Amino acid sequence: MRLKSIMCAALFVVAGQAAAQEKSITIATEGAYAPWNFSGPNGKLDGFEIDLAKVLCERMKVKCQIVAQNWDGIIPSLVAKKYDVIMAAMSVTPKRQEVISFSTPYGAHMNGFAVMKDSKLADMPGSGEVYSLNTQADAAKKRIDDVNAFLDGTTVGVQGSTTGSQFLENYFKNSVDIKEYKTVEEFNIDLMSGRVDAVFASATVLTAAFEQPDMKDAKVVGPLFSGDELGKVAVGLRKDDAALKAEFRLGAVGLRKEDAALKADFDSSIKAVADEGTIKTLSSKWFKVDVTPH
């Protein structure tokens, strides 16, 4: 009888372990923000966040499915539980934090302008300079004023519903015509065709775009800006997924606010892969610079 009880207990433990190993989560990405995330010629998702997601899922010992979701619906669909987390170069902002939860950041954004090389805007002041809106606020504001005067009367393209579009609205709405697009690819097309004079985006995204043959005549000009307004990238979760949040501590993963356990999993895993240098390695592969947040 005792042996039978022991065997039953052992089977229960094994079954429990198997169930834990079979845990799966679905990660949403945009699939249109290279090199952070994009769909290749074969339709397969690729990029920095795809590689990072695979590393994190392996560390958490969970099975992950990565799916593409249009940017405009990416947060509402998370809240509606169509998937479990967001990894889509999403910056952490107070407005987004009202709706979803975020992991510890796994990447940092630097944003700037790009123009065609033969543009009259190619000699924008501040080229090669980098300003933190957090620690160099006065110097950054002075340079923003210089760029405002330089861009007066021009049209600037930006992806809508992003920290970049909000930055332009906050600092440039009185001098430039801000034209919003659904994707980076759309505003790049209009830049090449002359329908916009400049575009504003993450420097990592712009640099990747310039590697494409049809974008070889574009370049980044003017200063680069970073700081809380432009965000650090994190995993996004529903607000109830706090435990999952703990496993992803460096990119910012977005989660539902109720997912506390999932958040915890992501936080700890992100911290671990950052500490061991994996994020730096993946940064070098995809961006040629280290985007590890500090």
Swiss-Prot record:
Record flagged with keyword Translocase: no
Keyword RNA-binding: no
Family: Belongs to the bacterial solute-binding protein 3 family.
Molecular-function GO terms, alphabetical: ligand-gated monoatomic ion channel activity
Protein origin, superkingdom: Bacteria
Protein's recorded name: Octopine-binding periplasmic protein
Any one annotated GO CC term: membrane
Endpoints of the signal sequence: 1-20
Disulfide bonds: C57-C64
Main location: periplasm
Keywords in alphabetical order: Disulfide bond, Periplasm, Signal, Transport
Organism of provenance: Rhizobium meliloti (Ensifer meliloti)
Job of this protein: Component of the octopine active transport system probably consisting of four subunits: Q, M, P and T.
InterPro entries in the cross-refs: Iontro_rcpt_C, Lys_Arg_Orn-bd, SBP_3_CS, Solute-binding_3/MltF_N
PROSITE patterns in the cross-refs: SBP_BACTERIAL_3 (PS01039)
Pfam families the UniProt entry points to: SBP_bac_3
PANTHER family: AMINO-ACID-BINDING PROTEIN YXEM-RELATED (PTHR35936:SF19), MEMBRANE-BOUND LYTIC MUREIN TRANSGLYCOSYLASE F (PTHR35936)
